Structures are given as structure tokens and as C-alpha cells.
């Protein structure tokens, strides 16, 4: 006959195995639902740049290594319209959406990407993003001294954080999704 400790250990071992199998099934089924909904080819996000303004900031908080020299920072004003409701199913805990601008670096082999705005969406009812005249959430600055009138391409990225399973990533192209960074005046 087995002791009480061995019986308890066997029960917990079997329960954890069954729960692991159920968790794997939940993740696979919810992933299949996302594939069927074709979430990796959602319609484009409508992005419209309303304005941009460059300024020189003299704080380490704004990226300046030498507070006396300062660093060029850019603030953007934009409109954004995107429907992320197909990303939600019964296993979705939240969707993290963020808008990025990608531009060439000093050398040809360098591509820079900066985050303009982000939002955590916890409910399917709030998943249609409609922003009018929104300001960039973060101070935009480059490791170099200036953006030097560079052009940037805008994309809306998302990642799904499920209740069970691994994160799922994707992105949407933005219509009119380009920015010409202004010159510092």
C-alpha cells in the first residue's frame, strides 16, 4: 500500500499534467480562430499627419547627453483610425497596440524605429481606435544630433497577450503612412 504522501504527490502530478494539456489545447484552438479570422491581413490603418514641430531640448530626459548642447526633439500631431476587433476572442487578455515610424540611419545598413504612440486595449468594445488630432505620446529623438529632414514610414503594430499561451505579434500598414521630419528652426 502507498503512503498518504505518495498518493497526494501522484494526484498533484496527474492534475498538473491534465492542466498543462488543457492549456495547450486552449492556446491551439484560440490560435486557429485567429488564423481563420485572418488577423495578419487586416485592413490598413488610416493614418494622417496633421503637423510636426521640432525643438531643441536641454535635458537628459529628452535624450541629450550633454545638457548644454541639447538634442533635437520632434512632436507630432496625427489622426489614426484602425479596427482591431478581429484580434479579440475568448482567450484574449489584452491587445497592446503601438504606432512606430521607421527611417534610415546615418549608414545604409542601419534602420531606425521609434515609437510614436501606444495603447493597451482590454475590451473588444474599445478595439476600434479613432484618434483625431492626437499628440505623439513620447518625445521623438534620434541617437544622432538631428533627424535632418528624413522621411519615415508609419506602421501600427499589435501584440495579443492571451490568458493562456504565447504572445502573438502582427502589424498593419498605415495609409498615407509617411512622415517628413521638420527642420529645426
Curated annotation (Swiss-Prot):
Membrane topology: Single-pass type II membrane protein
Residue positions the entry lists as glycosylated: 151
Topological domain spans for side Lumenal: 38-185
Keywords assigned: Endoplasmic reticulum, Glycoprotein, Membrane, Signal-anchor, Transmembrane, Transmembrane helix
Coiled coil: none
Top-rank lineage group of the source organism: Eukaryota
Transmembrane segments: 17-37
A GO cellular-component term linked to this record: signal peptidase complex
GO BP, sorted A to Z: protein targeting to ER; signal peptide processing
Primary location class: endoplasmic reticulum
Segments on the Cytoplasmic face: 1-16
Compartments, as annotated in UniProt: Endoplasmic reticulum membrane
Assembly and interaction partners: Component of the signal peptidase complex (SPC) composed of a catalytic subunit SEC11 and three accessory subunits SPC1, SPC2 and SPC3. The complex induces a local thinning of the ER membrane which is used to measure the length of the signal peptide (SP) h-region of protein substrates. This ensures the selectivity of the complex towards h-regions shorter than 18-20 amino acids. SPC associates with the translocon complex.
Biological function: Essential component of the signal peptidase complex (SPC) which catalyzes the cleavage of N-terminal signal sequences from nascent proteins as they are translocated into the lumen of the endoplasmic reticulum. Essential for the SPC catalytic activity, possibly by stabilizing and positioning the active center of the complex close to the lumenal surface. Essential for viability.
Family according to the record: Belongs to the SPCS3 family.
Protein name: Signal peptidase complex subunit 3
